[in-house]
């Protein structure tokens, strides 16, 4: 099986079916694949190498058609969102050394100067009559070819390009379609940026089964009024997002099953799904399936899943992350989750040093060090226990920051929580700051102190004395990354005033 053969075959069977719906425009499979074929034809006619191609733009029809067009030429695509800061874009271009940049938006002058070898989407629209049935799909990415490269943050500040092969993506897509019962003509929420690997949860399961992508623009996802209006006017069957994004949507009183009877399942990845969020969601959508999944970008989207229902909520205070997909083995070595098998990416693109640090061979199979702490419970279900990177030493004790956060979430009035270590000039931890967003509204510092006095005894019942936060800060909002996750780095900087 080849993903792009499947997409082309499906488009031949149902060319007039809607492939993607934007806020003001609908596009059929014929339109999408005709546009992708135009891209492929233009690239193939250019005297460029087989190196990866950067696609610079916003979510939607133009960028999706371009991604597919690049794949049809046998090249890897590198999605870079148009809202990406210039300095980061510059680092990605330097690291990737692409053969070409295709931009689907107008460029600012500094980006025009950066992208010296580039073409605009409008430059191949002269072939508008090109029929996708003429494309030779044998040239498409296949097997162990790199399908896409997602650039993630590196500890040194330099982005690392995770090189995901067609076989990686194929394994993921087949698992999604089977285990999540993706049927033909399903309508998927497509909210995640294409430069964020959560996007593949919607894109490829939808396109390989004749589904429709309900595409949200960044203008819609960052404006609550526009977001709620768009959701209420859309038919969605399968919801894909980070937990932080659904928490925003749950603020809308009209976001309930009665108003969204077609919403059959919610799939979450990208960050931890809290007990509280899952419980709220099931209260509002009692007949929908709620899936908690887990997996780093380096393991192609996700590699474990579990359906969260009332029984799971009753049995677990901190939600488990499930069981492994076919073709993947999970080992716990020194408390660390190790992923082995056909979902493990090729490595970091042209970065052998960083690749060697976390990718390795395990009994003849590809394996990856996640740096996530975890364990299997008595039901052989995998549980996430926080980032090993977030373990600190405080007064001689090793403390997992996310362990404290998990217990803060158990307190009814706490909606969001994050624990920040406070360090002195010698980088020694001198205190723990709990940053909290509460359902209560505190008008005065006295009210905050009264709440602290109330919750400390509750925390004392679940955490050791040395884990007790030394300071509590209350915020109305938590900053989010463009990918919809809580921005831990920005929040830490905000709390510590730029100093640690």
Question: What are the functions of these language-model segments?
Answer:
Residues 37, 125-153, 158-174, 261-379, ...:
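Adenylate-forming AMP-binding core of the ANL superfamily, especially NRPS adenylation
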């Amino acid at each position: 099986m080849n993903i792009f053969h499947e997409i082309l075959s499906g488009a031949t069977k149902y060319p007039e079916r809607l492939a993607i719906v934007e806020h003001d425009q609908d596009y059929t499979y014929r339109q999408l694949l005709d546009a992708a074929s135009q891209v492929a034809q233009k690239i193939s006619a250019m005297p460029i190498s087989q190196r990866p191609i950067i696609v610079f733009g916003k979510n939607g029809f133009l960028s999706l058609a371009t991604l597919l067009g690049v794949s049809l030429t046998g090249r890897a695509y590198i999605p870079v969102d148009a809202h990406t800061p210039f300095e980061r874009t510059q680092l990605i271009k330097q690291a990737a050394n692409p053969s070409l940049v295709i931009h689907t938006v107008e460029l600012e002058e500094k980006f025009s100067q950066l992208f010296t070898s580039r073409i605009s989407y409008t430059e191949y629209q002269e072939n508008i009559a090109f029929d996708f049935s003429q494309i030779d799909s044998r040239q498409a990415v296949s097997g162990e070819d790199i399908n896409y490269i997602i650039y993630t943050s590196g500890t040194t500040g330099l982005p690392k390009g995770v090189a995901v092969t067609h076989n990686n993506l194929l394994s993921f897509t087949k698992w999604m379609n089977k285990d999540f019962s993706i049927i033909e003509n399903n309508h998927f929420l497509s909210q995640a940026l294409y430069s964020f690997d959560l996007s593949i949860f919607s894109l490829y399961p939808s396109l390989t089964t004749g589904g429709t992508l309900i595409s949200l623009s960044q203008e819609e996802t960052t404006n609550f009024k526009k977001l709620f209006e768009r959701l209420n006017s859309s038919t969605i069957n399968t919801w894909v997002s980070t937990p932080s994004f659904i928490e925003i949507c749950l603020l809308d009183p009209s976001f309930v099953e009665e108003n969204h009877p077609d919403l059959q399942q919610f799939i979450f990845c990208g960050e931890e799904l809290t007990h509280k969020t899952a419980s709220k969601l099931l209260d509002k959508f009692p007949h929908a399936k709620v899936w908690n999944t887990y997996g780093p970008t380096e393991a192609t989207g996700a590699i474990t899943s579990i359906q969260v229902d009332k029984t799971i909520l009753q049995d677990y205070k901190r939600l488990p992350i499930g069981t492994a997909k076919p073709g993947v083995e999970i080992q716990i070595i020194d408390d660390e989750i190790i992923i082995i098998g056909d979902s493990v990416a090729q490595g970091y693109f042209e970065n052998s040093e960083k690749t060697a640090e976390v990718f390795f061979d395990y009994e003849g199979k590809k394996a990856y060090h996640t740096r996530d702490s975890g364990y299997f419970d008595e039901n052989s279900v995998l549980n996430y226990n926080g980032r090993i990177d977030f373990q600190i030493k405080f007064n001689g004790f090793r403390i997992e920051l996310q362990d404290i956060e998990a217990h803060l979430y158990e307190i009814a009035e706490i909606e969001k929580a994050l624990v920040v270590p406070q360090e002195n000039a010698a980088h020694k931890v001198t205190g723990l700051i709990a940053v909290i967003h509460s359902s209560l509204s505190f008008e005065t510092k006295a009210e905050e102190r009264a709440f602290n006095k109330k919750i400390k005894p509750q925390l004392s019942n679940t955490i050791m004395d040395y884990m007790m936060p030394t300071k509590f800060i209350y915020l109305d909002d938590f900053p989010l990354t463009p990918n919809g996750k809580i921005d831990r780095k920005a929040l830490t900087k905000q709390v510590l005033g730029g100093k640690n």
